[in-house]
Amino acid sequence: MGRSLKKGPFCDEHLMKKIEKLNETGQKQVIKTWSRRSTIFPQFIGHTIAVYDGRKHVPVYITEDMVGHKLGEFAPTRTFRGHAGDDKKTKR
């Protein structure tokens, strides 16, 4: 279930302030954030944001295709290592 259109997209204030400050000065640096729930805005394009996945900060370079998605979509929290193998060969 998506967010109501009358509410509009959400982005944490502290993250938006950091992005706007970097856009004004023209600097490019990695921004660490724990805000996986924030929507990616067009102002974010070209910046690298390190999104926390529960263990470490995963660097995510923002491109035009990512606008409208959430930051958490690009930093997976679980690592799938595959299902258990078939032990038919060893049972004989």
UniProtKB/Swiss-Prot annotation:
InterPro entries: Ribosomal_uS19 (IPR002222), Ribosomal_uS19_bac-type (IPR005732), Ribosomal_uS19_CS (IPR020934), Ribosomal_uS19_SF (IPR023575). GO terms for molecular function: rRNA binding; structural constituent of ribosome. Keywords: Ribonucleoprotein, Ribosomal protein, RNA-binding, rRNA-binding. GO terms for cellular component: cytoplasm; small ribosomal subunit. Coiled coil: none annotated. It comes from the Bacteria. Pfam families: Ribosomal_S19. Protein S19 forms a complex with S13 that binds strongly to the 16S ribosomal RNA. This is Small ribosomal subunit protein uS19. The gene is rpsS.
